[in-house]
Amino acid sequence: WQMIVEHKCCVIVMLAREIEAGKKKCEKYWPDAGKQLRFGGISVENRQEVNYSAFRRRVFSVVSEKQEQLTVYQYQFLKWPDHGVPQTTSNLFRMHRAVLKSCQELGNDNPIVV
């Protein structure tokens, strides 16, 4: 979260689920929906989770030690197979369009974290 605050990143893209084929693939670094966690001096609140057919969008309110507030969108792709690659690109393109729309809505061209 320190990097998110320092670079004012407003979009995070995840291509993996936390657990795939029974193995931990990604550490869960965010609070559950409606909850808030502190990471050092940074507060992260999960304000919303929306499930789409192939991905999930979370909206976080991030507040730094200096009380700077950011809205951060996290997109998590849910249809990547345990082995190989997706058979089609249509779901990835849907998520990509949603990511670009969020960037436009935020009026922000800061880095996207992948």
UniProtKB/Swiss-Prot annotation:
GO terms for molecular function: protein tyrosine phosphatase activity. The gene is STY-27. It holds the Pfam family Y_phosphatase. This is Tyrosine-protein phosphatase 27. It catalyses: O-phospho-L-tyrosyl-[protein] + H2O = L-tyrosyl-[protein] + phosphate. It comes from Styela plicata. The keyword Hydrolase applies. Belongs to the protein-tyrosine phosphatase family. The lineage of its organism: Eukaryota, Metazoa, Chordata, Tunicata, Ascidiacea. Disulfide bonds: none annotated. Its EC number is 3.1.3.48. Substrate binds at residue 82. Residues 1-114 form the Tyrosine-protein phosphatase domain. Keywords: Hydrolase, Protein phosphatase. It is an enzyme of class 3 (hydrolase).
